[in-house]
Protein backbone atom coordinates (compact mmCIF):
# COMPACT_ATOMS: atom_id res chain seq x y z
CA UNK A 1 0.00 0.00 0.00
CA UNK A 2 1.41 3.38 -1.05
CA UNK A 3 2.42 5.77 1.72
CA UNK A 4 0.13 8.77 2.18
CA UNK A 5 2.07 11.97 1.46
CA UNK A 6 1.49 14.68 4.07
CA UNK A 7 2.20 18.39 3.96
CA UNK A 8 4.89 17.80 6.58
CA UNK A 9 6.71 15.49 4.11
CA UNK A 10 6.81 18.29 1.54
CA UNK A 11 7.89 20.76 4.23
CA UNK A 12 10.78 18.51 5.29
CA UNK A 13 12.02 18.17 1.70
CA UNK A 14 12.13 21.94 1.20
CA UNK A 15 13.17 22.82 4.77
CA UNK A 16 10.14 25.07 5.33
CA UNK A 17 7.28 24.97 7.81
CA UNK A 18 4.03 23.04 7.37
CA UNK A 19 2.15 26.34 7.49
CA UNK A 20 4.16 27.60 4.49
CA UNK A 21 3.23 24.47 2.52
CA UNK A 22 -0.42 24.83 3.52
CA UNK A 23 -0.51 28.47 2.40
CA UNK A 24 1.19 27.67 -0.90
CA UNK A 25 -1.16 24.79 -1.77
CA UNK A 26 -4.25 26.83 -0.88
CA UNK A 27 -2.98 29.98 -2.65
CA UNK A 28 -2.94 32.10 0.50
CA UNK A 29 -0.72 35.16 0.86
CA UNK A 30 2.53 35.04 2.84
CA UNK A 31 4.53 32.84 0.44
CA UNK A 32 6.77 34.07 -2.38
CA UNK A 33 5.84 33.12 -5.95
CA UNK A 34 9.09 31.17 -6.32
CA UNK A 35 8.52 29.11 -3.17
CA UNK A 36 4.85 28.58 -4.05
CA UNK A 37 5.86 27.13 -7.42
CA UNK A 38 8.47 24.84 -5.82
CA UNK A 39 5.97 23.53 -3.30
CA UNK A 40 3.26 22.84 -5.88
CA UNK A 41 5.74 21.14 -8.22
CA UNK A 42 7.07 18.89 -5.45
CA UNK A 43 3.54 18.09 -4.26
CA UNK A 44 2.67 16.75 -7.72
CA UNK A 45 5.93 14.79 -7.95
CA UNK A 46 5.37 13.18 -4.54
CA UNK A 47 1.74 12.32 -5.27
CA UNK A 48 0.25 14.55 -2.60
CA UNK A 49 -3.54 14.50 -2.38
CA UNK A 50 -5.42 17.14 -0.44
CA UNK A 51 -7.27 15.51 2.48
CA UNK A 52 -10.91 16.12 3.25
CA UNK A 53 -11.62 18.76 5.89
CA UNK A 54 -12.34 16.07 8.50
CA UNK A 55 -9.16 14.14 7.71
CA UNK A 56 -7.14 17.36 7.81
CA UNK A 57 -8.46 18.34 11.25
CA UNK A 58 -7.58 14.90 12.67
CA UNK A 59 -4.09 14.58 11.19
CA UNK A 60 -2.65 18.10 11.21
CA UNK A 61 0.20 18.68 13.65
CA UNK A 62 2.40 21.71 14.24
CA UNK A 63 5.78 22.66 15.60
CA UNK A 64 5.25 25.37 18.19
CA UNK A 65 8.18 27.53 19.24
CA UNK A 66 8.43 29.07 22.70
CA UNK A 67 10.89 31.88 23.37
CA UNK A 68 11.56 33.27 26.83
CA UNK A 69 14.18 35.84 27.92
CA UNK A 70 17.05 34.37 29.92
CA UNK A 71 16.55 36.74 32.84
CA UNK A 72 13.04 35.36 33.37
CA UNK A 73 14.43 31.84 33.49
CA UNK A 74 17.14 32.94 35.94
CA UNK A 75 14.92 34.96 38.29
CA UNK A 76 11.66 33.02 37.99
CA UNK A 77 13.13 29.63 37.19
CA UNK A 78 10.48 27.41 38.74
CA UNK A 79 7.46 29.48 37.67
CA UNK A 80 8.38 29.74 34.00
CA UNK A 81 9.62 26.17 33.71
CA UNK A 82 6.25 25.09 35.07
CA UNK A 83 4.47 27.35 32.56
CA UNK A 84 6.56 25.83 29.76
CA UNK A 85 5.59 22.32 30.88
CA UNK A 86 1.93 23.36 30.80
CA UNK A 87 2.39 24.62 27.22
CA UNK A 88 4.00 21.30 26.33
CA UNK A 89 1.10 19.28 27.72
CA UNK A 90 -1.46 21.50 25.97
CA UNK A 91 0.41 21.09 22.66
CA UNK A 92 0.56 17.29 22.96
CA UNK A 93 -3.21 17.20 23.50
CA UNK A 94 -3.49 19.02 20.17
CA UNK A 95 -1.15 16.65 18.29
CA UNK A 96 1.63 19.25 18.23
CA UNK A 97 5.20 19.58 19.48
CA UNK A 98 7.05 22.33 21.33
CA UNK A 99 10.60 23.67 20.97
CA UNK A 100 12.09 26.08 23.53
CA UNK A 101 14.61 28.84 22.89
CA UNK A 102 16.01 30.91 25.76
CA UNK A 103 16.84 34.36 24.37
CA UNK A 104 19.91 35.98 25.89
CA UNK A 105 19.95 39.67 26.77
CA UNK A 106 22.68 40.54 24.25
CA UNK A 107 20.69 39.11 21.32
CA UNK A 108 17.56 40.91 22.48
CA UNK A 109 19.42 44.22 22.74
CA UNK A 110 21.05 43.74 19.32
CA UNK A 111 17.71 42.70 17.74
CA UNK A 112 19.09 39.33 16.60
CA UNK A 113 16.11 37.14 15.63
CA UNK A 114 15.50 33.85 17.46
CA UNK A 115 17.06 30.82 15.78
CA UNK A 116 13.66 29.13 15.72
CA UNK A 117 12.46 31.85 13.33
CA UNK A 118 15.67 32.33 11.34
CA UNK A 119 15.91 28.62 10.60
CA UNK A 120 12.17 28.26 9.84
CA UNK A 121 11.80 25.44 12.35
CA UNK A 122 8.36 26.37 13.65
CA UNK A 123 4.82 26.91 12.44
CA UNK A 124 3.77 29.20 15.28
CA UNK A 125 5.34 31.11 18.16
CA UNK A 126 4.49 31.68 21.82
CA UNK A 127 6.45 34.50 23.48
CA UNK A 128 6.55 33.75 27.19
CA UNK A 129 7.04 36.32 29.94
CA UNK A 130 7.73 39.43 27.88
CA UNK A 131 10.30 41.03 25.58
CA UNK A 132 11.10 44.66 24.84
CA UNK A 133 8.72 46.37 22.42
CA UNK A 134 11.47 47.02 19.87
CA UNK A 135 12.30 43.32 19.70
CA UNK A 136 8.66 42.29 19.40
CA UNK A 137 8.16 44.82 16.58
CA UNK A 138 11.20 43.39 14.76
CA UNK A 139 9.71 39.90 14.90
CA UNK A 140 6.32 41.08 13.69
CA UNK A 141 7.77 43.14 10.83
CA UNK A 142 10.19 40.49 9.51
CA UNK A 143 8.33 37.22 10.09
CA UNK A 144 4.81 36.16 9.17
CA UNK A 145 4.77 33.44 11.83
CA UNK A 146 1.48 33.29 13.79
CA UNK A 147 2.23 34.50 17.31
CA UNK A 148 0.65 34.63 20.76
CA UNK A 149 2.00 36.43 23.84
CA UNK A 150 1.66 34.53 27.13
CA UNK A 151 1.76 36.11 30.60
CA UNK A 152 2.25 39.63 29.22
CA UNK A 153 0.87 42.10 26.70
CA UNK A 154 2.22 45.07 24.78
CA UNK A 155 -0.26 47.86 24.03
CA UNK A 156 2.02 49.18 21.27
CA UNK A 157 1.67 45.96 19.25
CA UNK A 158 -1.54 44.42 17.99
CA UNK A 159 -1.13 40.78 18.90
CA UNK A 160 -3.11 38.04 20.64
CA UNK A 161 -2.16 37.68 24.29
CA UNK A 162 -3.16 35.57 27.28
CA UNK A 163 -2.65 37.04 30.75
CA UNK A 164 -3.79 36.53 34.31
CA UNK A 165 -6.16 39.14 35.72
CA UNK A 166 -3.47 41.06 37.58
CA UNK A 167 -5.61 44.12 38.24
CA UNK A 168 -8.49 42.19 39.82
CA UNK A 169 -6.18 39.86 41.74
CA UNK A 170 -4.32 42.71 43.43
CA UNK A 171 -7.59 44.56 44.03
CA UNK A 172 -8.96 41.43 45.75
CA UNK A 173 -5.86 41.05 47.94
CA UNK A 174 -5.94 44.70 49.03
CA UNK A 175 -9.66 44.52 49.79
CA UNK A 176 -8.94 41.45 51.91
CA UNK A 177 -6.38 43.38 53.96
CA UNK A 178 -8.89 46.18 54.56
CA UNK A 179 -11.45 43.57 55.63
CA UNK A 180 -8.90 42.31 58.16
CA UNK A 181 -8.74 45.78 59.70
CA UNK A 182 -5.63 47.13 57.98
CA UNK A 183 -5.74 50.80 57.01
CA UNK A 184 -2.06 51.46 56.30
CA UNK A 185 -1.09 49.25 53.36
CA UNK A 186 2.06 49.44 51.22
CA UNK A 187 2.94 48.00 47.81
CA UNK A 188 6.18 46.31 46.74
CA UNK A 189 7.04 46.37 43.03
CA UNK A 190 8.67 48.81 40.62
CA UNK A 191 5.74 50.48 38.86
CA UNK A 192 6.13 50.51 35.03
CA UNK A 193 8.94 47.91 35.13
CA UNK A 194 6.52 45.34 33.67
CA UNK A 195 2.89 45.46 32.56
CA UNK A 196 1.85 42.94 35.21
CA UNK A 197 3.43 44.91 38.07
CA UNK A 198 1.74 48.08 36.84
CA UNK A 199 -1.65 46.38 36.60
CA UNK A 200 -1.23 44.94 40.10
CA UNK A 201 -0.29 48.37 41.41
CA UNK A 202 -3.40 49.88 39.81
CA UNK A 203 -5.58 47.21 41.44
CA UNK A 204 -4.02 48.15 44.77
CA UNK A 205 -4.67 51.86 44.11
CA UNK A 206 -8.32 51.23 43.21
CA UNK A 207 -8.87 49.47 46.53
CA UNK A 208 -7.16 52.31 48.42
CA UNK A 209 -9.36 54.93 46.75
CA UNK A 210 -12.54 52.97 47.44
CA UNK A 211 -11.57 52.88 51.12
CA UNK A 212 -10.88 56.61 51.29
CA UNK A 213 -7.10 56.27 51.27
CA UNK A 214 -4.46 57.89 49.09
CA UNK A 215 -1.15 56.43 47.96
CA UNK A 216 1.81 57.19 50.18
CA UNK A 217 4.89 57.28 47.98
CA UNK A 218 7.15 56.12 50.82
CA UNK A 219 5.04 52.96 51.08
CA UNK A 220 5.50 52.05 47.40
CA UNK A 221 8.82 50.21 47.34
CA UNK A 222 10.86 49.47 44.20
CA UNK A 223 12.09 45.89 43.92
CA UNK A 224 14.02 46.04 40.62
CA UNK A 225 15.45 48.50 38.13
CA UNK A 226 13.18 50.14 35.58
CA UNK A 227 14.72 48.23 32.65
CA UNK A 228 12.75 45.12 33.50
CA UNK A 229 13.78 42.70 36.19
CA UNK A 230 17.25 43.09 37.65
CA UNK A 231 16.28 42.74 41.28
CA UNK A 232 17.65 45.21 43.78
CA UNK A 233 17.70 45.45 47.55
CA UNK A 234 14.83 47.54 48.85
CA UNK A 235 14.76 49.64 52.01
CA UNK A 236 11.88 49.49 54.45
CA UNK A 237 10.24 52.87 55.20
CA UNK A 238 10.93 54.67 58.48
CA UNK A 239 7.22 54.72 59.32
CA UNK A 240 5.94 51.23 58.61
CA UNK A 241 2.53 50.24 57.22
CA UNK A 242 0.76 47.31 58.87
CA UNK A 243 0.63 45.30 55.62
CA UNK A 244 2.29 44.96 52.21
CA UNK A 245 0.81 43.86 48.88
CA UNK A 246 3.66 42.32 46.86
CA UNK A 247 3.70 41.94 43.08
CA UNK A 248 4.67 38.25 43.25
CA UNK A 249 5.34 35.50 45.76
CA UNK A 250 9.11 35.58 45.28
CA UNK A 251 9.24 39.26 46.19
CA UNK A 252 6.86 38.65 49.09
CA UNK A 253 9.28 36.04 50.45
CA UNK A 254 12.13 38.58 50.20
CA UNK A 255 10.02 41.16 52.02
CA UNK A 256 9.34 38.67 54.81
CA UNK A 257 13.05 37.88 55.15
CA UNK A 258 13.92 41.59 55.26
CA UNK A 259 11.22 42.22 57.86
CA UNK A 260 12.53 39.36 59.99
CA UNK A 261 16.09 40.64 59.61
CA UNK A 262 14.97 44.07 60.81
CA UNK A 263 13.17 42.64 63.82
CA UNK A 264 9.57 42.45 62.56
CA UNK A 265 7.54 39.24 62.73
CA UNK A 266 5.04 38.17 60.05
CA UNK A 267 2.11 38.31 60.58
CA UNK A 268 2.31 39.46 64.23
CA UNK A 269 3.85 42.87 63.38
CA UNK A 270 3.36 43.19 59.62
CA UNK A 271 1.09 41.23 57.25
CA UNK A 272 2.25 40.27 53.73
CA UNK A 273 0.40 38.96 50.66
CA UNK A 274 1.89 37.72 47.39
CA UNK A 275 0.75 36.88 43.86
CA UNK A 276 1.08 33.72 41.66
CA UNK A 277 0.83 30.93 44.27
CA UNK A 278 4.13 29.59 43.05
CA UNK A 279 7.05 29.52 45.45
CA UNK A 280 9.62 26.75 45.56
CA UNK A 281 10.44 25.15 48.93
CA UNK A 282 12.75 26.94 51.33
CA UNK A 283 12.08 30.50 50.18
CA UNK A 284 9.52 31.37 52.84
CA UNK A 285 9.07 30.29 56.45
CA UNK A 286 5.32 30.91 56.57
CA UNK A 287 2.38 29.79 54.36
CA UNK A 288 1.57 32.83 52.24
CA UNK A 289 -1.80 34.36 51.44
CA UNK A 290 -1.78 34.96 47.69
CA UNK A 291 -3.70 35.08 44.41
CA UNK A 292 -3.16 31.90 42.38
CA UNK A 293 -2.48 32.16 38.65
CA UNK A 294 -4.24 29.47 36.59
CA UNK A 295 -1.22 28.36 34.54
CA UNK A 296 -3.01 25.36 33.04
CA UNK A 297 -5.85 27.40 31.59
CA UNK A 298 -3.51 30.17 30.45
CA UNK A 299 -1.31 27.69 28.57
CA UNK A 300 -4.25 25.80 27.06
CA UNK A 301 -5.78 29.08 25.89
CA UNK A 302 -2.51 30.23 24.32
CA UNK A 303 -2.05 26.95 22.42
CA UNK A 304 -5.68 26.93 21.28
CA UNK A 305 -5.41 30.52 20.01
CA UNK A 306 -2.16 29.79 18.22
CA UNK A 307 -3.55 26.71 16.48
CA UNK A 308 -6.58 28.73 15.43
CA UNK A 309 -4.28 31.38 13.95
CA UNK A 310 -2.17 28.74 12.17
CA UNK A 311 -5.22 27.15 10.60
CA UNK A 312 -7.62 30.03 10.14
CA UNK A 313 -5.78 33.17 9.14
CA UNK A 314 -4.27 36.14 10.94
CA UNK A 315 -7.32 37.80 12.51
CA UNK A 316 -6.51 39.10 15.98
CA UNK A 317 -8.74 38.24 18.93
CA UNK A 318 -7.03 40.64 21.35
CA UNK A 319 -6.43 40.12 25.07
CA UNK A 320 -7.65 37.06 26.96
CA UNK A 321 -7.89 37.54 30.72
CA UNK A 322 -7.73 34.33 32.74
CA UNK A 323 -9.17 34.56 36.24
CA UNK A 324 -7.17 33.19 39.15
CA UNK A 325 -8.16 32.28 42.70
CA UNK A 326 -7.68 33.97 46.07
CA UNK A 327 -5.97 31.69 48.60
CA UNK A 328 -5.96 32.51 52.32
CA UNK A 329 -3.09 31.14 54.37
CA UNK A 330 -1.18 32.39 57.43
CA UNK A 331 0.76 35.53 56.44
CA UNK A 332 -2.00 38.00 57.43
CA UNK A 333 -3.24 38.93 60.91
CA UNK A 334 -6.54 40.64 61.67
CA UNK A 335 -6.14 43.89 63.62
What name fits each language-model region?
Residues 1-60:
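N-terminal helix-turn-helix DNA-binding module of bacterial transcription factors
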Residues 1-5, 59-175, 234-239:
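Alpha-helical recognition/docking segments in bacterial nutrient-uptake
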Residues 17, 49, 123, 182-185, ...:
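Short acidic/polar active-site loop segments enriched in Thr and Asp
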Residues 69-82, 100-108, 162-172, 188-231, ...:
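Hinge/beta->alpha junction and helix N-cap segments in small-molecule ligand-binding domains
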Residues 93-94, 208-215, 238-239, 261-266:
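Short helix-capping segments at alpha-helix termini
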Residues 183-184, 215-218, 266-272:
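Short acidic capping loops at alpha-helix termini that bridge into adjacent secondary structure
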Residues 231-335:
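Flexible loop/turn connectors
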Amino acid sequence: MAKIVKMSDIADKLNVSTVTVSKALSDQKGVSDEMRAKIKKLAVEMGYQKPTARQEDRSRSFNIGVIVPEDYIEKYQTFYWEMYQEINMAAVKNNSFVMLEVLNAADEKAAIPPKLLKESKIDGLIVLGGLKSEYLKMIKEHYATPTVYLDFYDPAIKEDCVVSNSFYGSYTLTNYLFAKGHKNIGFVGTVLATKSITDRYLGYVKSLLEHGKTVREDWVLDDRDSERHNFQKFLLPEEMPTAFVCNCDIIASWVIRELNHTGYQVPEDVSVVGFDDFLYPGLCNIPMTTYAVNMTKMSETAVRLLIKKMTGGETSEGMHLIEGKFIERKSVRAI
